[in-house]
Structures are given as structure tokens and as C-alpha cells.
């Protein structure tokens, strides 16, 4: 697993645990940061988590617009957490190609989700990318 893959896995766990345990972001983030030995990874995890929660209303709105016959709250906690992470990356991390974001999200869905999670996540994120990803990301 690459450093960035590991980082995404840990960010997913922060998002998931925050909702599952209903702890503060700071508490969950602190717990997760103890796992990481790399200063760079800690900085990336912190940037992602802060970025996700600072932009959560916009992220959730864009996900919701790409769901067909579903509401965001009806999604499993795993799928919702993955979609939030990947949507943040699609919209706000300009150096990450769209294909990498989708591939990494699918891998997290295969690891933690249900049998159908990876296909569902891929389909929703494809719509998010086509509808909302910055134009310059399409050429990375």
C-alpha cells in the first residue's frame, strides 16, 4: 500500500469513526494520528480531514445531486464516508487525477463495504467527477 493509499484509508477511518462513535473530529483525528509515524502523512491526514469538514455541506450537496433514488442519509455509513472522502479529493486536491481518486475509493469500498459497495461508489463518483470536478483535473 502506498503512502497516499494508507493516508486515504486513515482519513476514511476518521470520517467513519466520527459518525459511528459521535466523537468530536479532534478526538478521532488525534486517535488516528497516533497510528501514523510519518510527519508528512500526519499533515496530509489533517489537511484532508479539515478540508472535508470545512466543506461538508457543499460535498454532501454534490453527492446528493448524483444519487438516484437514494438520499445521503439512507446510505450505509461506510459508503457515505468513502463518498465524502473521494468527493473532497475530486473537488479540492488538484494534484490527484480523477482516475486515481476513483480507483482508491473503489479499493476502500472493497475492503470495508458490502458486496455492492464498490460498484455503487464508482458509479456515484463518476457522476460527481463528470458534473463537478474542476476542468483542469480532467487533463492530469
From Swiss-Prot:
Q: Which Pfam families match?
A: NusB
Signal peptide segment: none
Q: Report one GO cellular component.
A: cytosol
The entry's keywords: RNA-binding, Transcription, Transcription antitermination, Transcription regulation
Which InterPro entries does this UniProt record tie to the protein?
NusB-like_sf, NusB_fam, NusB_RsmB_TIM44
Q: Which GO terms describe its biological process?
A: DNA-templated transcription termination; transcription antitermination
Q: Does the keyword RNA-binding apply?
A: yes
Query: Which branch of life, at top level?
Result: Bacteria
> Which GO molecular function annotation, any one, does this entry have?
RNA binding
Q: State its role.
A: Involved in transcription antitermination. Required for transcription of ribosomal RNA (rRNA) genes. Binds specifically to the boxA antiterminator sequence of the ribosomal RNA (rrn) operons.
Similarity field = Belongs to the NusB family.
The record's HAMAP family line, in alphabetical order, gives: NusB
Protein name, entry field: Transcription antitermination protein NusB
Q: Which organism is it from?
A: Pseudothermotoga lettingae (strain ATCC BAA-301 / DSM 14385 / NBRC 107922 / TMO) (Thermotoga lettingae)
Name the lineage: Bacteria, Thermotogati, Thermotogota, Thermotogae, Thermotogales
Amino acid at each position: 500500500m502506498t503512502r497516499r493509499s494508507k493516508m486515504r484509508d486513515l482519513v476514511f477511518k476518521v470520517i467513519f469513526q466520527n459518525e459511528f462513535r459521535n466523537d468530536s473530529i479532534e478526538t478521532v483525528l488525534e486517535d488516528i494520528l497516533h497510528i501514523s509515524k510519518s510527519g508528512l502523512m500526519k499533515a496530509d491526514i489533517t489537511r484532508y480531514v479539515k478540508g472535508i469538514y470545512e466543506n461538508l455541506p457543499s460535498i454532501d450537496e454534490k453527492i446528493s445531486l448524483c444519487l438516484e433514488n437514494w438520499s445521503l442519509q439512507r446510505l450505509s455509513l461506510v459508503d457515505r464516508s468513502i463518498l465524502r472522502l473521494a468527493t473532497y479529493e475530486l473537488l479540492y486536491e488538484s494534484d490527484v487525477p480523477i482516475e486515481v481518486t476513483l480507483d482508491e475509493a473503489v479499493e476502500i469500498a472493497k475492503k470495508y463495504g458490502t458486496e455492492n459497495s464498490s460498484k455503487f461508489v464508482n458509479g456515484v463518483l463518476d457522476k460527481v467527477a463528470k458534473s463537478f470536478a474542476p476542468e483542469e483535473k480532467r487533463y492530469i
